[in-house]
Design a protein with these regions (language model features):
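Single conserved hydrophobic/aromatic residue that forms the stacking wall/gate
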Residues: 1-11
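Glycine-rich adenosine-cofactor-binding loop
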Residues: 35-56, 64-67
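Short amphipathic alpha-helix with an adjacent loop that forms part of the alpha/beta core around
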Residues: 118-127
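E1/E1-like adenylate-forming module used to activate ubiquitin-like modifiers
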Residues: 128-176
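Conserved SAM-binding strand-loop segment of SAM-dependent methyltransferases
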Residues: 107-113
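Glycine-rich phosphate-binding loop and adjoining beta1-alpha1-beta2 segment
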Residues: 65-103
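N-terminal charged helix/coil linker that caps or initiates catalytic domains
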Residues: 9-40
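Short glycine/serine/threonine-rich phosphate/pyrophosphate-binding segments
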Residues: 47-53, 73-74, 137-143
């Protein structure tokens, strides 16, 4: 006799088919941990857009995208979501739609605001596995990093040179 499979089984099979390479690389327990992960990407520009897409393509189960900016034609050379048809649209909304087509099972939160002292809590007051900081401005970057350290939330920081003009003049300093 043929058993009727529930929708959960169908999604599980689709997920397995889509991300079987991740299980081969990290094992089933690693793949399951990635599927349960919730990562926030703050700043959906040249670094954040590529980071968010990599998370979706890795099978991360929930992604929160935070940025208030719209896509500009000048973003085309460095931002994965910057296409002729997306110019003028919200970065987080366009990115969420794109990620949904890559990983339909991923829960996506598109938060249309900049990270500030007032909005920091709304981002970090959720169960996060990690944060990717792709913020250009130094002040909100420092706020985010300090709060992630305080809360014990793993954070990867990257992005532009804090709005500086010459990123080739690298100095190593404490951001505090």
């Amino acid at each position: 006799s043929v058993k009727s499979r529930g929708l959960g089984d169908v999604y599980k099979r689709q997920y397995h088919d889509r991300f079987s390479g991740i299980a081969r690389l990290y094992g089933n327990s690693g793949s399951d941990a990635i599927r349960r992960a919730h990562v926030a990407v703050i700043g959906i520009g040249g670094v954040g857009s590529w980071s968010a897409e990599a998370l979706a393509r890795t099978g991360v189960g929930e992604i929160t995208l935070v940025d208030l900016d719209d896509i500009c034609v000048s973003n085309t050379n460095r931002q994965i979501h910057a296409l002729s048809q997306t110019v003028g649209q919200s970065k987080v909304n366009v990115m969420a739609e794109r990620l949904h087509t890559i990983n339909p099972e991923c829960h996506l939160n598109a938060e249309d605001y900049f990270l500030t002292e007032k909005t920091l809590e709304s981002v970090l007051d959720r169960p996060l596995t990690g944060v990717i900081d792709a913020i250009d401005a130094v002040r909100p970057k420092c706020l985010l990093l300090a709060e992630c350290v305080k809360r014990g939330i793993p954070v990867v920081t990257c992005g532009a040179a804090g709005g500086r003009n010459d990123a080739t003049l690298i100095r190593i300093e404490d951001l505090s």
